[in-house]
Amino acid sequence: MQYNFKVEAFEGPLDLLLHLIHRYEIDIYNIPVAEITEQYLSYVHTMKELQLDVASEYLVMAATLLQIKSKMLLPKHEEDVLDNGDDFIDDPRQELMERLIEYKKYKQVATELKEREQERAQLYTRPPIDFTSLQQEEETSLPLDVTLYDMLAAFQKLMRRKKAKKPVTTRITRQEIPIEQRMTDILKQLEIQGGRQSFYDLFVDDEREIMVVTFLAVLELMKNQQIVIEQEHNFDEIFVSSYTKSA
C-alpha cells in the first residue's frame, strides 16, 4: 500500500514542539530535552509510518534535539564559559527556547488577526467573492480545533493498545483496502450510530494495514469537511461526528 498524504496543518517542527509543550504542560523556559526529544521522535516516526509527507525541517529539528540532548549529558566544567568572557555556562537549550518563544508570539498574533478578520467579515452584507481558484493550498488544511498532532497521539495510543491485546501467535493476512472505500464505510458506520462515534471504535480490525488505511480515511474525511473531530479536554477521548450532525 502506498498513499502519500500531505496536509498543510503540519506547520513545521516548531509547531509540533509547541504542541508537545502544551499537551504535557511543560515549562517553555525549562524544557526537559530528553523527554521532549523522545516524544518528538515518536511523532515523526508515526508520521513516516503513515506515509505522511514529512518535510525535511522535521528531520533537521530531530537532529538538533539529539545534539542538544547530548550536550546536556556532558559534564560541566568551570572552563566551559562563553567566548565573550561571561561567567556562566551556556545553556544548550537557549537558542531553541528563544525560537519557540518567538514562534509562539507569532502564532498568537496570527490567531488574533484571523479573529479580527472574521469579526469584520460579519459586518458586511456584500455577497462573498469566490476565491476558490486562489485557495488551492488552503484546501488541504484542517479547519478544526483538534489538530493533526492530537490525531497522531490518538493513533499512537490505539496502536499500543492493539499491540498489547494481540496474541503473539496471531497470523497476519495482508489486505489492501482503497482509501475511498474506507471513507464510505466510515460515513455509513456514523449514520448507523446516529452521526457520532468514538474514534477508537472505528478501528475494529487489528491488522496494521487496515488500521493505517482507516486513519488516513479519517484524515481525508476531515480535509473534505465530511466529519468533525471533537475532544473536550487534553487527553480526553476523541469522538468523530458527521458534518451534518455537528452543524
From Swiss-Prot:
The cysteines covalently paired via disulfide bonds are none
A cellular component term (GO) from this record? Answer: cytoplasm
Q: Which InterPro entries match?
A: ScpA, ScpA-like_C
Asked if the record carries the keyword Ribosomal protein, the reply is no
Q: Which domain of life is it from?
A: Bacteria
Under Gene3D superfamilies, the record lists: 6.10.250.2410, Structural maintenance of chromosome 1. Chain E (1.10.10.580)
- Entry annotated with the keyword Lipoprotein: no
Q: Which Pfam families match?
A: SMC_ScpA
Q: What is its main location?
A: cytoplasm
* GO biological process annotation, one example: cell division
Keywords attached to this entry: Cell cycle, Cell division, Chromosome partition, Cytoplasm
Subcellular localization is given as: Cytoplasm
The protein's role, per its UniProt record: Participates in chromosomal partition during cell division. May act via the formation of a condensin-like complex containing Smc and ScpB that pull DNA away from mid-cell into both cell halves.
Q: How does it assemble?
A: Component of a cohesin-like complex composed of ScpA, ScpB and the Smc homodimer, in which ScpA and ScpB bind to the head domain of Smc. The presence of the three proteins is required for the association of the complex with DNA.
Query: To which protein family does this belong?
Result: Belongs to the ScpA family.
Listed NCBIfam families = PRK00104.1-1, PRK00104.1-4
Q: What is this protein called?
A: Segregation and condensation protein A
